[in-house]
């Protein structure tokens, strides 16, 4: 079970939102590169970046901050990025700059064929982000709720080579209320693509439940406010997850 620190970028700063509300942003650092280095020092094995301004604008808006993070990271760990990725040219540029995996969100909902094109052009470098409120997918920085159900939409991407589905429960994001385990597991059971949980991670009980769900296809979880507010220590939490993974694997063997 991989715990992936999130670095959400707004106006060049590292922030955390509450339920995706841009007016409820807490600034945790004005130096995203330093924040990336901090998480690496804590044992992060991957970083999850979101260009929040880009998600609303439909194009990248925090490229300077993204480049500062990539400079700080170097070749140490992979970096995934979502928010405002709507064309193949942007994907190519990001991969050339050092991003390991791009996350297609709004564009995947509005034009699923774009995901297939991206997977064909950049195999092994594409994930899909599905963000939902009450089971319905949201787009445009979570500002619009669609009629699409998460599982129905996710099934469209099964045969195209998508590396993972990042599933976010908007209602829990930034609220420290616990991961929506039931919805995450149901999604993982319904599709053949690995699932990364997002939204609400708060304590070791969440980690325990997620580790139990690994055999269902849940491969990781995005860690946000819990590690910024020190409710969870990243290094200790990852160690705990590693121990649980071994424990549950032994039980199933």
Swiss-Prot record:
Q: Which gene encodes it?
A: hisA
GO biological process annotations for this chain's record?
Answer: L-histidine biosynthetic process; L-tryptophan biosynthetic process
Name the major location: cytoplasm
Gene Ontology MF terms in the entry: 1-(5-phosphoribosyl)-5-[(5-phosphoribosylamino)methylideneamino]imidazole-4-carboxamide isomerase activity
Q: Which reaction does it catalyse?
A: 1-(5-phospho-beta-D-ribosyl)-5-[(5-phospho-beta-D-ribosylamino)methylideneamino]imidazole-4-carboxamide = 5-[(5-phospho-1-deoxy-D-ribulos-1-ylimino)methylamino]-1-(5-phospho-beta-D-ribosyl)imidazole-4-carboxamide
- The highest taxon in the source lineage is Bacteria
Listed GO cellular component terms? cytoplasm
The family database entries (HAMAP family) matched by this protein are listed as: HisA
The metabolic or biological pathway listed in the UniProt record of this protein is: Amino-acid biosynthesis; L-histidine biosynthesis; L-histidine from 5-phospho-alpha-D-ribose 1-diphosphate: step 4/9
Question: Mind telling me which CDD domains this protein's record contains?
Answer: HisA
Using the UniProt record, name the top-level EC class of this enzyme in a single word.
isomerase
**Would I find Cytoplasm among this entry's keywords?**
yes
Could you list this entry's UniProt keywords, alphabetically sorted.
Amino-acid biosynthesis, Cytoplasm, Histidine biosynthesis, Isomerase
| EC assignment | 5.3.1.16
Q: Where found?
A: Cytoplasm
Q: Does the keyword Amino-acid biosynthesis apply?
A: yes
Active-site residues (renumbered): 8, 131
Membership in a protein family: Belongs to the HisA/HisF family.
Family annotation (NCBIfam families): 1-(5-phosphoribosyl)-5-[(5-phosphoribosylamino)methylideneamino]imidazole-4-carboxamide isomerase (TIGR00007), PRK13585.1 (NF010112)
- According to UniProt, the name of this protein is 1-(5-phosphoribosyl)-5-[(5-phosphoribosylamino)methylideneamino] imidazole-4-carboxamide isomerase
């Amino acid at each position: 079970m991989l715990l992936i620190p999130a670095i959400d970028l707004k106006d060049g700063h590292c922030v955390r939102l509450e339920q995706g509300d841009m007016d409820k942003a807490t600034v945790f650092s004005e130096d995203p590169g330093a924040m990336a280095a901090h998480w690496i020092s804590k044992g992060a094995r991957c970083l999850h970046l979101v260009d929040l301004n880009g998600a609303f604008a439909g194009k990248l808006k925090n490229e300077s901050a993204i480049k500062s993070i990539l400079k700080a990271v170097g070749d140490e760990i992979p970096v995934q990025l979502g928010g405002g990725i709507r064309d193949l040219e942007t994907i190519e540029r990001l991969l050339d700059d050092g991003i390991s995996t791009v996350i297609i969100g709004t564009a995947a909902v509005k034009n699923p064929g774009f995901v297939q094109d991206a997977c064909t052009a950049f195999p092994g470098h594409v994930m899909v982000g599905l963000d939902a409120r009450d089971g319905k997918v949201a787009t445009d920085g979570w500002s619009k709720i669609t009629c699409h159900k998460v599982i129905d939409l996710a099934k469209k991407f099964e045969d195209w080579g998508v590396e993972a589905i990042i599933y976010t429960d908007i209602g829990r994001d930034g609220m420290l209320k616990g991961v929506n385990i039931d919805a995450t597991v149901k999604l993982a059971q319904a599709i053949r693509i690995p699932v990364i949980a997002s939204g609400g991670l708060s304590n070791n009980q969440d980690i325990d439940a997620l580790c139990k769900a690994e055999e269902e296809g849940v491969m990781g979880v995005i860690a946000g406010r819990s590690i910024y507010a020190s409710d969870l220590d990243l290094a200790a939490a990852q160690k705990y997850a590693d121990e649980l993974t071994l424990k549950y694997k032994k039980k199933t063997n």
